[in-house]
């Protein structure tokens, strides 16, 4: 899959790309963000992330544990637990 050009729009690069158990893609971006994609249509899922990244995720990326894009019409964002 050729996803790096898509992430380049946000000045991001894929640092690690792994197919897990032949079921889903695990991506680690150079800014530390972890992204999960389904095996089918990963570019459509990345487009969904690109649509909201600048407005929603970019300013909070250090607090995000992962973004899961394996849903048909949305995504899940898991935030890291705060240590007090």
Annotate each language-model stretch with its function.
Residues 1-84:
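Charged, solvent-exposed interaction patches on well-folded alpha/beta domains
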